[in-house]
Every structure is written in structure tokens, then in C-alpha cells.
Design a protein with these regions (language model features):
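Non-catalytic alpha-helical scaffolds and adjoining flexible linkers that form interface surfaces
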Residues: 1-23, 28-239
Length: 239
């Protein structure tokens, strides 16, 4: 059965040359999640798609097709383009790459779409990059069914104690440590105080920000596999 969709809100996640004059594109859409499609002739100098198919530009796309890869029938501008520069640009590309790597095609994620849009707006503004990225990573894991529970010990169900240390196991959670490891030498152990700060998205303290980044890298790594994040290779300062 052929799919026909008109004026679907979307953001471009990635594009790559396809055949002589076309582009193979990945979109994150409001109702259909990740959509892979061909934009025919988009690389031609006079193509109407050429200037529109840019990351972080709110779009309205129309597409059709029977198979996994659809055909783009129309692209229109939506709201004003979100402009990201320097580390905020690479942070946005990092977020896009997470979606490409972790989302399946044609699975609806309307809540995540709204969160993605909010993340881009916050990156464009003056909000602290670390807090914006950690919030998105936590929301992404929750949407995929792998929520990180920052409220309690997964075995005892006791509330996280700011004076205790916890061992983190991806996709399971935090378990009270019976020992008192040196946290800087024990990558899987975290301070309860730092976990509470992350829960409240208060990453102003450098040590808390580093712990939060380490935690989310571990939580994501089991789903991303061994292939490195390209945007992290390009810019290692923030993501």
C-alpha cells in the first residue's frame, strides 16, 4: 500500500549525495518519527529544495512511496530557522546523530519531537549547553524505554541518599555501594549528591557536570554500540 503524506512538520537530520543529482535524506517528523527519503534533483543548482534542506530549519514536507525509502514531493519552510554556531552547532549535530542512530523508521515520537524542538531553541539561546544536552539524553532514553531512574536504588527502592555512593548498571539503575570507592577512579560509581543535582538539572558545579556526562555516556553506549559518534570526534569539548 502506498503512503501519501502532506505537509508533515519535520526537521532534517542528515543528507547525503544520491545518484547524480539527488539527495538521500533523513527527517525527524512529528507524526511518523524518523523518515528516510530521496529528494530527487535536490543537488541541481536551480532545485527548489537546495536551500531548504538544511539542519535545524523547521519544515513542512510531503512524501509518498511504498517501500522503506520514500520520495519527497514537496518541502516548505515552517517557523523561523534556528541558527546554531560553534559548540552549539556541534551540540545540535550530536543530538541529530543520536536520533539517527537510535530511532527506528516510521515510529511515532511526538513527545520526543517537541523535546527536540525545545532543545534546539535552548541551544540557540543562552542556556548552559551541558544541562540542555543532558536533559535531551535523559528524555531520549525514557522515550526509548530505557529511562534512568534518578529517584531510587533499583534493588531496595530506597530514595537516593546525597551522602551515599551508588554503582550504575545501564538499563537497570543505581545500587547502593557497600564500599566507599574513589569516584574519580571508579567510572561506574556516582555520588548520590551528584545524582540529585542531575535530577534537578543543576549542573553549575563542574564536578556534577562531569559526572552527568559520564553517566549519560554509559547509559547511551549500550545502545549506540562501538561505532563512535562523529560529531563527538569533530568537537570533543561539550558533548
Amino acid at each position: 500500500m502506498e503512503t501519501r503524506v502532506l505537509l508533515q512538520p519535520a526537521y532534517l537530520l542528515h543528507r547525503a549525495p544520491f545518484q547524480n543529482t539527488s539527495l538521500l535524506v533523513d527527517f525527524f517528523t512529528y507524526n511518523y518519527g524518523r523518515v528516510k527519503a530521496v529528494a530527487k534533483g535536490a543537488r541541481r543548482e536551480r532545485s527548489k529544495y537546495r536551500s531548504l534542506l538544511q539542519p535545524f530549519h523547521p519544515l513542512l514536507i510531503s512524501f509518498s512511496g511504498r517501500g522503506e525509502v520514500k520520495t519527497i514531493n514537496g518541502v516548505e519552510t515552517g517557523l523561523s530557522a534556528i541558527v546554531l554556531e560553534r559548540e552549539r552547532l556541534f551540540s545540535g549535530l550530536y543530538v541529530n546523530e543520536l536520533l539517527i542512530r537510535l530511532l527506528y523508521n516510521y515510529q511515532e515520537h511526538t513527545a520526543l519531537y517537541k523535546n527536540y524542538q525545545e532543545t534546539l531553541i535552548n541551544l540557540q539561546g543562552s542556556k548552559e549547553i551541558e544541562a540542555v544536552l543532558r536533559r535531551f539524553e535523559l528524555n531520549l532514553l525514557t522515550e526509548l524505554g530505557y529511562a534512568v531512574n534518578l529517584e531510587e536504588d533499583f534493588r531496595s527502592h530506597l530514595t537516593i541518599d546525597p551522602k551515599s555512593n551508588y554503582r550504575f548498571t545501564p538499563d537497570m539503575g543505581f545500587e547502593l555501594s557497600e564500599t566507599n570507592p574513589k569516584l574519580e577512579e571508579s567510572p561506574h560509581y556516582f555520588s548520590g549528591q551528584h545524582l540529585i543535582a542531575l535530577r534537578e538539572f543543576d549542573l553549575r558545579d563542574e564536578a556534577v557536570a562531569k559526572s552527568a556526562k559520564r553517566l549519560l555516556r554509559q547509559a547511551l553506549a549500550v545502545h549506540l554500540g562501538e561505532k563512535p559518534i562523529n560529531s563527538r570526534v569533530l568537537f570533543t569539548g561539550k558533548v
